[in-house]
């Protein structure tokens, strides 16, 4: 299977060269294809899968997709990548257009993700505190500010009685952007 995957990678690099320099690396037991460190496609078991996006939805409706899946802890996980069938390989213009849609959507998502402010980026916040806030429904800075430190602390306290007043002060400092 590995040699089939490499053949498909090289064929993809050749067909999609107009998108830029396509690099590959191992990921989830498959290979990710990237342009400028942005993943837009995967190769698994000798098949190319493109990242599904809004622009490719019409194609996916007309051609019911086979989704990329992999095993994680004994469970099947379906990724948002659809298989490129032989008819699409025969229509290189359409393949390049759909690949460009996938790449553009991935680049757009990457830029919005990089501009979005995470809770852990605030003063006094750690990855652990961000995680437990997420467990009580507070997933971003906006929600933290709207609810306020006291309400967030009460939600945390309701779920875990070991949450101390120190966390309340940390939340206050994070909202006010001051270290405690």
Please place each PLM-identified region on the residue numbering.
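Structure-specific DNA junction-binding interface
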Residues: 1-94, 108, 159
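C-terminal extensions
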Residues: 1-3, 25, 31, 108-180
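Long, highly charged amphipathic alpha-helices
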Residues: 7, 11, 97-101, 170
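A generic alpha-helix structural signal
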Residues: 13-16, 99, 153
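Short flexible/disordered coil segments
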Residues: 82-99, 137-139, 172-179
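Short, structured interface segments
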Residues: 91-114
